[in-house]
A protein has these predicted regions:
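Short, Gly/Pro- and small/polar-rich lid/capping loops
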Residues: 4-9, 343, 356, 361
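Flexible phosphate-sensing "switch/lid" loops adjacent to ATP/NTP-binding sites
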Residues: 1-322, 327, 347, 370, ...
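Extracellular/periplasmic helix-exit of transmembrane alpha-helices
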Residues: 339-347, 351
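Catalytic nucleophile serine of serine hydrolases
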Residues: 332
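Conserved P-loop NTPase catalytic core
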Residues: 348-375
């Protein structure tokens, strides 16, 4: 079996649209009949996923795998950094946590991870036709280039041709692309096979003179101008846009607390797509108002975010709303906060040993430890969502003692989470993806508010996701010079037949 061909997408900066371009290429190559997988050697993100075999990986490569029509595999993202503070992260290698590291300590040791990166990449290359590689940030961060393992450093290791993308929506795209190319070493510059203008709004003809000058100055072809595509696909780069977005006015108002270390906010994307549910993210009591449901999401630092909740006045506001009958849902770290007590005897979560009082809305006690619980599971929800089937995954380091009713029952019969009155808590991420729990929750909130939910039909999440991947692929396929991209990989479209 011949080894896979590859193409790498690098960007002029974070947020240039690399993740979605890679997802689009994965979909396009899959549509063209190739076995394709994504790859990113090192990802820094708070949003993560647990694979079927219990390994943790970044969600960007999960989305790209879904676009390619393959099951997420930790080899697609061998190194994941989950920031726990401004200067440190939890380092996850091959799906398992290696511990907390400062940025300085990680930079000193990261080249020792090259064998892990190459083992993951080479094993994928033996099983597939094409690997779509995503870079990180910019390849022209000259202070980081010496020990680079994710941009040109990786391209050299796997001999990858590179496409360089710039975001025109932010302005200055010609300077971005030209400056990036000029800051590269000659051998790095030689790897770039073409430039991509991303997120363009307007008439492409207006760009023609600029494109011609850019090609003349860089001696590189512009392989496409990709329009600003309005597709509903979760995107690591869209985090701030999504959290800042103004919620559409809909009959039911859901307020999600925007915790400082919020993680896996992607849990709630299915709620945003429901015709009756308006979802907004709030940071203070003024924004909170009087919603129909309050959600405490997951967090990478439960203890610090609980302190913030208390100091910001949001804890008191949530307690008042709950006392007045407003439903409250906590997921993972948010679930832990809703309990009576959180204990960190070894300082695993907060840096120093401590015990904090929770919100006291659920009869639970959480104790943090060193071992992280990673698993995929299926479950059936209990009242008031009785019968709803859900699938999800757990990523948490604490164990929680529950002195009350369960939120759901796992496939093996184990009770999970907690319910007390109108307060619900669960460790399950991805709980709304199947749609059944979303419908049960919507019906429950409608009853609470006296609204008739009739006529509000929800497209199944998986069907909707596939539609969006096809829309993305259609838009990018129409914009890019695909024959040139195939040629850059040493291929021709159709040579797999």
């Amino acid at each position: 079996m011949s080894k896979a061909k590859c193409i790498m997408v690098q960007g002029t900066m974070s947020g240039a649209g690399k993740s979605l371009l890679c997802a689009a290429l994965c979909r396009i190559f899959a549509q063209d009949g190739y076995r394709v997988v994504p790859f990113k050697s090192q990802n820094m993100a708070l949003n993560s996923f647990v694979t079927r075999d219990g390994a943790e990986m970044g969600r960007a490569q999960v989305v790209q795998a879904q676009a390619a029509g393959v099951e997420p595999d930790v080899r697609m993202n061998p190194i994941l950094l989950k920031p726990s503070s401004d200067v440190g992260s939890q380092v996850i290698v091959n799906g398992k946590a290696r511990g907390q590291m400062s940025a300085a300590d990680y930079f000193r040791m990261k080249r020792s991870l090259i064998p892990d990166i190459l083992e993951a990449y080479n094993s994928l290359a033996e099983e597939n036709d094409i690997i779509v590689i995503e870079g990180a940030g910019s390849p022209a961060e000259i202070n980081l280039k010496a020990d680079d393992i994710v941009n040109m450093g990786l391209a050299k290791l796997v001999d990858a041709p590179v496409l360089l993308a710039g975001d025109i929506d932010r302005g200055g795209v010609f300077a971005q692309l030209y400056g990036t190319v000029e800051l590269l070493e000659p051998q790095e510059r030689a790897r770039i096979k073409g430039l991509i203008i991303n997120k363009f709004r307007g008439d492409v003809e207006i760009l023609r003179p600029g494109l011609a000058m850019l090609e003349e100055k860089t001696h590189l072809p512009v392989l496409g101008v990709v329009p600003y595509l309005r597709v509903e696909i979760e995107d690591e780069d869209s985090l701030s846009d999504r959290l800042d977005a103004k919620a559409a006015v809909k009959p039911l108002d859901i307020a999600i607390l925007r915790l400082p270390h919020v993680s896996n906010f992607t849990d709630f994307i299915p709620l945003e797509q429901h015709p009756l549910l308006g979802v907004r993210y709030v940071q203070n009591t003024r924004q909170l108002g009087a919603p129909d449901l309050v959600i405490l999401p997951g967090t990478k630092n439960t203890m610090d975010d609980l302190r913030w909740l208390r100091e910001s006045g949001l804890e008191a506001a949530v307690l008042r709303l709950s006392a007045a009958g407003t439903p409250v849902l906590g997921v993972c770290g948010g679930y832990q906060m809703l309990g009576e007590q959180l204990c960190d005897p070894a300082g695993e979560e907060s840096g120093t040993p401590c015990t904090l009082r929770g919100l006291g809305l659920l009869p639970t006690t959480t104790v943090f430890g060193t071992e992280k619980h990673l698993t995929q599971t299926a479950a059936r929800a209990a009242a008031p969502f009785a019968g709803a089937a859900l699938t999800g995954y757990e990523i948490h380091a604490g164990s929680t003692e529950v002195r009350g009713s369960a939120f759901c029952t796992l496939a093996d019969g184990t009770p999970e989470g907690c319910v007390q009155g109108n307060v619900f808590g669960t460790y399950l991420h991805g709980l709304f993806d199947t749609g059944e729990l979303t419908e049960k929750l919507t019906a429950f909130l409608c009853r609470q508010k006296g609204i008739d939910p009739a006529g509000a039909e929800l497209i199944p999440m998986e069907q909707y996701r596939q539609q969006q991947f096809d829309l993305l692929a259609d838009g990018v396929r129409a914009a890019l010079d695909l024959p040139a991209i195939y040629a850059a990989m040493g291929m021709q479209k159709g040579d797999n037949t």
